[in-house]
Amino acid sequence: MTSSTSPETPSDPSQTRYKRVMLKISGEALMGDQGFGLHPPTVKRIAHEIKTVHDMGVEICMVIGGGNIFRGLSGAAQGMERTTADYMGMLATVMNALGMQAALEGLGVFTRVISAIRMDEVAEPYIRRRAVRHLEKKRVCIFAAGTGNPYFTTDTAATLRANEMACEAIFMGKNGVDGVYDKDPALHDDAVRYDEISYDEVLAKRLKVMDASAIALARDNNLPLIVFSLDTAGGFRGILAGEGTYTKVQG
């Protein structure tokens, strides 16, 4: 499916669908065609997509996974203590957050990295009221180190912070897929994309959108989830302007 062309970019948030949003992307999204780490041109491209939305006047929160560097579950599966592996994964998210901060500020977007684990030399500690103030000053807030606790994914961290920051929706940017499908479109040519689906259906059908804890937290707080493709230039901005291809999960 192809997305329609975006209209002229709105100059203020009153002309967009949402005024404050949470953007969740995986660490793997920063790898580009590499097998590990950060690919600077890819990070810069994603930063540019974020800047175009920031320029619309939208207040942006962000959570980035750490799977391009280390994934806690994988470490635990190989015999590492789960708690230690999860903390290592949290540190990986801080590295990704700093990389994205550098890319955004290189484009002139003021940014704050806010860590759930104190590391004052590189990031601010998480204080909700301070983070809200950053958003009001039009700074992008990148929340790092998950929730600060093992056994919780970055999907859950994104949903938690979205609720705490009073975001109006979570935008989940995906690679290679433009929404939620009834089965894996990479393996099944007859896979069908949902335009809209409820959280209960996602859980009942075991669709791989977010982990169950994150889905329950979003559902119980009436927080919609927009799943879209990060690969489409202008896709993030287009959806906020009311266009594009995506799946909306709510209810």
Swiss-Prot record:
GO terms for biological process: 'de novo' CTP biosynthetic process; UDP biosynthetic process. Pathway: Pyrimidine metabolism; CTP biosynthesis via de novo pathway; UDP from UMP (UMPK route): step 1/1. It is an enzyme of class 2 (transferase). This is Uridylate kinase. Belongs to the UMP kinase family. It is found in: Cytoplasm. It catalyses: UMP + ATP = UDP + ADP. Allosterically activated by GTP. Inhibited by UTP. Residues 32-37 are annotated as: Involved in allosteric activation by GTP. Its main location: cytoplasm. Its EC number is 2.7.4.22. UMP binds at G66, D86, T147, G148, N149, P150, Y151, F152, T153, T154. Pfam families: AA_kinase. The gene is pyrH.
